[in-house]
């Protein structure tokens, strides 16, 4: 079982995720024809991308598969492949490896006769395959009890001014979401109107770590605004905030858990 992927698409993926993590877990769902890429950033923050299987990302297998990919290592070795290469990614779960391979054929004039010259490249990278994550992505799409749009640069500017604090209070009032620093002196408050806000949600308040919000800084060059949702599970437990956007050709989700 392996994934065949165009090098341009692979470059996008590793360039993006290597800013946040040295490795990611890849989960291929052959039934839904989707590939999920997941990284745990620490501080109760998870990030994942959803990529449809297509001509540029093709899965050669019938069963679902989960494996780890060392994105930092892959990023540094892609210069070994031709710019038009289609790369096979084949995990070796038993030996804690992942293999990248590709070939390229060029025609060379030999005594006025074109001769095909084939170049094969294979790279084996070590990575612990015994700690792959099977992440329940659908859990965070079951229910939404609040929705707004947050301008990333303005949010980053706001939290830069309050770096002396550890968390923000999150409250809901009159169909608005309010982010506020603790206390009443030298207090900062940011308020967003919401396109969706359940009446039940406005009875609650939460806390979110500023260190978690700071992890959005890695998106600054790629994202202008995030669709932001307050998500809950099927038992109506409020889970946290889900930031979503489409970056280049794939959808990105960042989930942050509310603090107790």
From Swiss-Prot:
User: What is the induction comment?
Assistant: Expressed in the intermediate phase of the viral replicative cycle.
| Subunit structure comment from the entry | Interacts with the late transcription factors VLTF-2 and VLTF-3. Interacts with the late transcription elongation factor VLTF-4. Interacts with itself.
Instruction: Family membership, please give it.
Output: Belongs to the chordopoxvirinae VLTF-1 family.
UniProt name for this protein: Late transcription factor 1
Species annotation:
Vaccinia virus (strain Ankara)
Q: What does this protein do?
A: Associates with RNA polymerase to initiate transcription from late gene promoters.
User: Which key words tag this protein in UniProt?
Assistant: Activator, Late protein, Transcription, Transcription regulation
Name the Gene Ontology biological process terms: regulation of DNA-templated transcription
